[in-house]
Structure formats: structure tokens, C-alpha cells
């Protein structure tokens, strides 16, 4: 036996009948490696099978994981089986569907046989709303409370990148660690100079921090090789009875010496590595692993393999290396948010549902007079919103019609359910402010006969324009406030009545009443050709292109627009050959004292029709833009882009992200995405003298500088 504690010179001697051969060799000892093996099945909600079958498979993995942990309970340390559900969704679904198992689930968590990590789903975190991020941890916080076992690792699989704004939320929720396992496909620079290098990640508040580790891509153990050998009997199998409960093939290749030797050659500074063991996506667990690990550890002192959960891995790194690790700030800009562009309408529904839920919860606090909020109903609405933000969309094989249609149907339902629930919760929260219905038909003057309450759910005073439906404003076009003072109003082409309501106090309401007659007030809005004006701005739309070519503040000649704004272009996949639209008409949409609007109708490649409306409202220092694209269902990849070229040289672009503000480039990691970025509600482009704040209600994605995808 050659000693391995230090580098040694060893002489090999070979003696023959009449000759002796000697050779000196240098023996470098192998590091005393600990290999932490994280057993899981990657959780895609859909993608490889119907949602129902995927849910059943992951619930079964927990049940089988409990059995395998019991079977291997007498194995030596490191070889006892531990199952990691990866995210909270499989455990939560099992908790809800099998209440008789709840005590057992808590008990196996206490024993360390099931290790529950902190996130509910694998999410596009950068498109999550501020409040939404707290609901990511709701279920696992409850399980942590019941079990007393820390669920303090945010595991993110598949998705390259995650939002900087996650950090302060994690800190508040007691989640101390992140392990990121990004895919290697469509991942850009996500793996560049970062895999296997832990560091402290400081949040945008400059105070909160978590310990971050990116071991590499998931299944970096090579386990997908075995997954491929199985033929993936779980993939696209309609009958769940035909899916094996577990995978048993009598072997699992846990010889990682080649990987470890490569790390040593790269001067990797640590004595551990972290590997993911997953056979593929949504797969049955591999029951061979604990037996292969036991055999390996009994045969070799090192490398030692340790079947682990996330907390064990990260707490080891913190304890052993925490005070030696670098501190990093900035945004790990996500790559896979482009999927939202394939479902722009549904994405808009989810964004608006989030805002409604925030309003509903605020109004409940304002009106319930201390009454208990329907917390479970609110939480379930947020759960559907999270399912919309989850990273999977359709079937892995899009040419297979049954699964493609079945999976897409359920994915769409999450957005619709979230929208419906948000509307219901808003209606319920407003109930204390409503009058009793006056008979089956109601008053002939409409439901607003008793007046209208206008609520401000912001923590600052607010003025603005509200819309009353035709039924809510049957009595007339004139509106009075609670003191009888007339308010500026305008009946528009949709039949709705616009009303300017000034100075609603923070977290309070104002009362208005629709009365007979016409509005007698004069507003500041007017149209001159294709120029819209109010008392703050003048915006000019080019009659030929339909683009905004001029934006001036009143009293100034400075044009905030560069080459044009709200410009349409269609881009074929992977070819930088954009095509513009052809304007069919530019027409007046609205013209009155409170609002003026121009509507541009055009045709373009890849679309049946495009409409772009530009609107100003009296007293408001902003331009409202509404674009509607009637897109053709093309099979080949393509994209729709609206460009905004501002005349703001040497400017900086700052973006509203969850719980923070990110400056483009300055605050982005080198590993982050540059092709498209996500924002919450606004971005700001400013230099030392001028600036534009650009808000988007429906669309979270933007490109910076030029079309980049």
C-alpha cells in the first residue's frame, strides 16, 4: 500500500532471473473528497406527461422514498437513503390528497428521510410580483413549523438565473441558502466561472444576504445516462399503472473519480463536491443508489459519498468555509422568461390578477372593521398565480397532439383560475361598501344610483381617471363629488364614462355621484392633426408610419423621442431581418375635454392586424399607449417587438425588480442574460438633465439597446 497523506517518490522494483529494473515515480495523493449526492426527480409541472399523471408520479416518489429510507435505515452513515422532493409542490399535493399520511410526513421529516426544501415550485422568479415571492415559501414554512426541521434552502432547477429581489424575501422568511442547478441548454453564460464556487449574495437592500452555490447543471452526476438506458417508461405514458413505481436495474454508477480528478487539475480549492442524481424530468426514483453508495463506501475510504439533503450540504459549507467566501451583489438575470412571450395574453391576465389581489387584501383591511380575512381563499388564489409563473408550458414533444393539447389546456386554466379568483376576492372585499339591491331588477338608474366609492389602496394621496361602465352611469354624463362640486368627465366611444377624481387620501376613499346632464367643465385636451395635447404634454404621431416621432413638455422644445417610439417590427426566428408594418389608417379614437386618442391600424407579416392607440388625459403628465396584435399561429419561430428610441444620450436605465431597483449592466452578473430582461411595473431611462419613466401593465419583457432575440 502506498501512503497517500503527502506527495511521495516511490521506487518500483521488478526483479527477473538475471535482471532488476527500477523506476521512480511521483505519487500525488488524491484529496480526501466528500461527494454530497442529492437524490431527486426534476419537477416539471406537466411537460413530460399530463399534470394529473405528473402529480401522481411525484407523490409516489415521496411514498416510495419513505419505504426505501426504511429499508436502508441500517446502512452506514452516508448510504442511508434520503429523498428530496426538490420543491414543496409534491409534498403539498400529497398532504392535501392523503390527509391520513400527514402525521407520517411530519415524522419522516424529523428523521431526515424526506428533506423538504424551501421553494414551492421551479419559478421564473424575475416575473414574480413582490407579494407573490412571499407565497413561494408559505407551505414549506408551515411544514418547518410542524416538524421543527429547517427548510432553509431555496433549490432552483432547470432555469438559468434568478431575481436579485429574491434575497430580501428569503432573509425575512428565514431561508438562508440557495442551490442553483441551471440547464446547460439555452443558458448563455450561466455556467461561466461560477459552477462549484460558493459565495455570499447580498440583496438590493444592501443588508440581506444568503449563501449561494451553483454546483453545475442538474444530473451533473451523469445519472441521465442511466435514465436514458431505461427508455424513460414514464415519458408520455397515459396509463400511470404502466409507469414503474421505482427504477431498479441492479446498479448505479457512483464512481466519480474522473470528475474529482478533473477538479483537482483545475485547482478547485475545496474538499467536497455536490452532485445531483436525477434520471431525467419527472422520473421515478432510482432505488439502486443507496446500495451502490454503501458498496462504494465500504470498498474505499475516499472519495466518500454522502446521500444528502440541501440543508446538510449548505450548512457544511457555511460552517467550514463561510468566513472565507467572497461577497457578491447584483442580478443573476434570468434566461427562460422568453416563454412568457408565447402566451402574452395569459401573462397579462396573471399580472393583472396579482394587482387585483393586492388591492383586495388592502381593501379588506380598510373595510372589514377588524373582521378576519378569508386567508385560505387568498392563499389559493396566489397558488394559482404561482402555477402560472412556474417555468414549464407545453409537452416536451410539441408534435404529439394528445399531450400537447392536454398539458396546454391545464396550463391555461391556471391563469384563468387566478384571474377569476382575484376578481372574486376583490368583489368580496368591496362588499361592505355596497348597498342592498333594490329588487330583482335594481334601480332603473343603474347599480350606481346610490353613488360610487372610489378607493385609493396606495399609501400616498392619488388623483386619477376612473372608468364607469355604461350601466354604472345610466343617469347622465355629469358627475359630482361629495360636496356637490362638479368633476371633469367624458363619455367615450365604448359607452363608458371617464371621470377625473382628484386628491383621494392614502388608504381612504372618495364618494362621487352620477347625475343627469352633460359635463360643463372645459378640459385641456385637444387634437391638432395627428398631434395630441393636454396641459402637460404634446405628442405627435407620424401619419405615414404610425410611430410617435415627437414628445414635448409644454413650454419646452426638447424632443424626448429619438428615431421613433412605439415602432412595430416582426422578426423571424434566428434571422436578424426585421420587417415593419404598413399603416392602413390613422383615426381619431376619442376627442373630448378629458381624453384624446389617436388609433393607428396596420397590417404586417405574421399578423392579421395590429392596432396602436395613443392617448392623453387632462392633467396627466404621461402618454398612454395600448397595442393589440392579432397574431397568426405560425409554426416557425418568430417574434413581435415594439421599439422605443428615446433621445437621452449618456443615460442610465434602471429597472423595477422585486423588492429593488436594478441598473442595467452595472447591476447584472456577467453570467446573466442580456437578450431579454424582466421588470415589475416600470423602468426609467435618464441622464443628468432629462428622463423618461416607461411603465408596462401587461408585458414584463424588454430588450435593451436593440433587438437581441
What are these regions (language model features)?
Residues 468, 478-486, 566-570:
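Acidic, glycine-rich two-metal-ion catalytic cores of nucleic acid-processing enzymes
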Residues 16, 481-482, 534, 553:
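Structural motif
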Residues 455-475, 638-647:
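Surface-exposed beta-strand/loop patches in extracellular or lumenal glycoproteins
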Residues 424-468, 521-534:
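Surface beta-strand/loop "capping" patches
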Residues 50, 216, 466, 517, ...:
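Residue-level detector of alpha-helical segments with a strong bias toward transmembrane helices
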Residues 457-461, 513-563, 628-630:
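Beta-strand-rich N-terminal accessory domains
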